Every structure is written in structure tokens, then in C-alpha cells.
Amino acid sequence: MLRSAAELQLAGDSASRPTVAIVGAGASGMLFSAQLLHAGVAAGAGLRAVLLDRRETLGGVAYSTLDPSHRLNVTAAGMSAFPDAPDHFVHWREQLGGTASEPDAYASRAEYGRYLSAVLAAAQRRAAPALSLERLVAEVAAVEPAHDHVTLRLAGGGAIEADIAVLALGNLPAAAPPGYEELADHPRFICDPWLPGEIERIAAAGEGPVLLIGSGLTMVDMALSLARFRPDGRLIAISRSGLLPRAHLPGCVAPRPVPTLVDPNVSFVELIDRVLLEARNGSARWRQMVDGLRPVTQAHWRRLSFEQRAVFMTMRHRAWSVHRHRMAPEVAARVSELLASGRLELHSGVPELTRVAGGRLVLSLPGGDDVDLSLAINATGPVLDPRASTQSLVRQLLAAGHVRAHPLGLGFDTAPGGAFRRRDGASHSRLLTLGPPRIGELYETTAVPEIREQALELALNVVARLSGERDALALSASTG
């Protein structure tokens, strides 16, 4: 149920149940909220949860897109919301469609967003009335953790007090890439294509050439949308590497364990190099090896020293990413069509953009040609380093010292279990997170298969903690 901030504050004033505030209603926030309700029911715990997001639509950026060409890059068989029910998404699709669902299908992200909404709604029905989850459409301007509570101050005024706050921030919104900051206000430059209204702005642009800065999955999404909006428009993608994400093969292919995965004497970097060598040599099994390495990536990453992680990010991260985060087969086929027809061009290098009189924006291609652009779109993807984020809440948290960036600029500095570390290095007991903010700690943490595991673990820990505090207070009252 959607409620106003005033209604929630009034309810909170009279509520005796512990309160958990979840900031962010994307996949991370929705998965955690559902698991929190399930864990509360199982433990017989009464609690109140408040799910806050400035968007009225659930699903966050990834799963609120309405473009049917935006697909999951994992098969339906791998996208269950529940670690202990791997076929849950497949069965949901069957019930929805009334026919057998294909486990190896790559569903649209919009459909997956509807699934997450259904999962959360079912959890709410099961938990009521002992546990409640209330949704609030509001921007959280500041989070202020204290010894025994957390205060969330809302941009529109007012505040909510919680016993624990889970910041399900997801991927941080895109910011202007280094060197392009002065173009952020240019009418033909789109800094973050996922902001509300920007897709419509892209669709309404003229038929002139469009520059896509980047060549990863965000570029792919934009290219597919632009190809629908502008059937004859020229698309130019440029990135430093010029590397496109690789493609999944059709069908469900079982992961192939790399023989040395369990050998602690073989480093993560050596494993990555072996897999990339297989890919360069044209081996048919490299995809299975990538997927076989995924379940143990976090353990290997944790064993790397700071220096080894820094070298990996500089020397191997991009190459590994294009093999690890692959395109759905039908998406890859469409991108290949666009490239073959010449409608999409792919270049390596750094785009040179020049402001020209009359509000024009001109691109100088590596070969020397100048192109008068209709639009230039930042498609480099989400910001990794929170210090580069323009999000007001992130900036407030950093400035106040309640959180700190990971030393390598990989998300936030977090402790095992998802607690944020403060500026002084101590971890918060009441300010927690999951998913992409933990990339520096875990590396493999941005996709649903990992986030659902974290959501379950975090929910169990939160319920256990709040139940323990409630019992301690009851004991204190009875003996006082």
C-alpha cells in the first residue's frame, strides 16, 4: 500500500513493532523486502517495514523499462527470486501464460519486473497482519545512524525513524564520463539515459547521427531502442576498448567447473587468464568455464591482496566483463544485424566532442571525419566509485562520514554481512546494504543469483537481531 510520509510518521509514532527501512525499490530492495517478510513469519516476529523509493514504479531502472527488446542476460532457469526454489520464475511464467515455459528463454526485463512485484505482493499477503510492508514514494535526502536507531530525512520534509536501515541502492546512476563534465548541460548531450523522460527525449530526436559513448550492455540497450525509434538513423558507438559483450549460446548449458577452481594455490588472476585464453583460442567451452567460475569468484576475490585487486581492475576487468556479462542470443543477433547493415558503427578510442555555434555538437571520428550529431548519449553504464556520484543521498552519506568508498573506488567499503564501514573504518550495526554497493568486497555481486542469496542471509540476520533486542527489552522490563 502506498502511503504519504505524514501517514507513515503517524503510524510509526504509535507502533511498538521494530521498524526496518529499505531505501530503494529495485531488485535488491524488493528481494530483501520479500525475504524479510518470509523470515519474520518463520520466526514469529512482529515487525514493520517501510520501502522507500522516489519512483512510483517498482523494479528500479533495470526492471521498469517498457522496451520489449531489453532482455535479461540470464535464462529464466537462473532468475528465481528464491535460492531454495530455483524453478520459481519458470513456474510463475507457466502459470501466467497457461502453457509450459521454456527454462532457457531470456525473458524481457519488464516481465521480470512484474515477477518481482508478484513475489513481493505474495509475501505481503502471507505476512499480514503480524508483519507489514508499507511503500512510500519519496526521496531520502539524508540518513543519520545513531547508536540505537537510524533517522531517514525525506526531501519533501519529515523524517522516519527505524531500528535498522537497509540501503538497497543498486547500481549508482550514470554521471558524465571524465573529460565530458562541461557537456553535461548541453541540450544534445544525455548524461543518464535512464532518467525519467530521457527515453522519450531520445525517441523525439531528429534523424541525425547519434553517438553512444561506451560499448557495453547499456550501449546495447540504447542501440536497440534507437533502432526502433529511428529506423534509418546512424548509430556510432565508441569506447576505449571497442569491445562488445559476448553472446550467450541458445539453450541452457551446464557450467563446466575449471579443474583448478578448488585449488587454493591457483590465484583468481590465473584462473581468469586460463578462461580468457580458451576464448581467444576459439574454444567452444569458454562460456561453461566462465559460468563454472562464478560460484567461487567471491572466495577467490577475497583472497587477493589490495595490490592484486588493483592490477586486476586495470589489466583484466574489462576483458573479463565482456565474457562474464553476455548478451541474450536474440539481442546479440539484432546487434549483429545492425553492425552488418552499417546502421551501427563500432569504434575504439576516445570520442572528441566539440560545441559549435547554434547549439550543435560535433564528433571527430578517429579516422578524421567530423559528424554533426543529433544526440550524444553517455552509455558507459553505472558509476562504480560513489565519490563520483551526483546522487544527493550518496553525497550526504560520504560527507557525513557515515560511509566511505572502497579504496579502489569499487562501490562502498563494506564488512562481511553487508554492514557499511564508516569513515573511521568501524562497521555500522544498523546501516546495511546488499548487491552492487558490495562490489569492492565481493566483486561478483551485481546480478540476481548473487543478490537473492544476500537478501536471504541479510533478512535472517536482521530478524534475528531485532528479535533479540525485543526479547532483551522485555526481560529488562520484567526484572526492572
Give, region by region, the residue ranges found by the protein language model.
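Flavin (primarily FAD) cofactor-binding/catalytic cores of flavoenzymes
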Residues: 2-56, 61, 99-266, 272-468, ...
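Redox-cofactor-proximal catalytic regions of oxidoreductases
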Residues: 53-98
